[in-house]
Amino acid sequence: MHLALNFKQKPYIGFVLIPDKNQLWITDGKKTWCEKRDGTKYKPNLLNNKNLQEMTLVTSKNHGNEILRNLIQKINFCKVQIMGSIGCKIASIVHGESDIYICLSLPGKSAPKDWDFAAPESILKSAGGAITNLDNQELSYGKSSFQQGGIIVATNDKKNHPSVCVEIKKIIQ
């Protein structure tokens, strides 16, 4: 479950609930933390892998396509983890279980919506990560279609994020 409060068309406060892991990821817009069902709290633990080949990719179990599979094969990530919702994928980055998430929506196919990305984005950004389209432009919310199409990249390091996008773009072209 994802819940976000957007301010000026950008997610600010967010909650991502992952019941099967007993995790509730929360951001107040300044910091991110996780609360377990027993009341235990812990902070983000983002990894510091800078090279794509050293990174662990988290990707979808249901929305893969041939272009994304080819990209994953060309990059030769250290490890690839498959899991469900965008919130789970972003939480895995913030928790230090993975480094990068790539979402590729093809024209004419179903694309993730604002409500899929808003809360996870707010949690990742306040933890020190970044999420943009492949051209390193921030996601835009509140469009009439509510769709977040194209290629979206989420990483564990906002400083290294632009160079990761450039590297992925070179591999695709």
Regions found by a protein language model. Give the residues of each.
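Tryptophan-centered short beta-strand motifs
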Residues: 11, 40-44, 80
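DPxDG-like acidic metal-binding loop motif
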Residues: 1-37
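Flexible, glycine-rich phosphate/dinucleotide-binding loops
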Residues: 23, 33, 41, 66, ...
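Short helix-loop capping/hinge motifs at secondary-structure junctions, enriched
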Residues: 31-34, 39-41, 158-164
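A generic local secondary-structure boundary/capping motif
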Residues: 2-3, 44-47
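Short linear motifs in exposed loops
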Residues: 15, 28, 36, 45, ...
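An extended, acidic
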Residues: 46-173
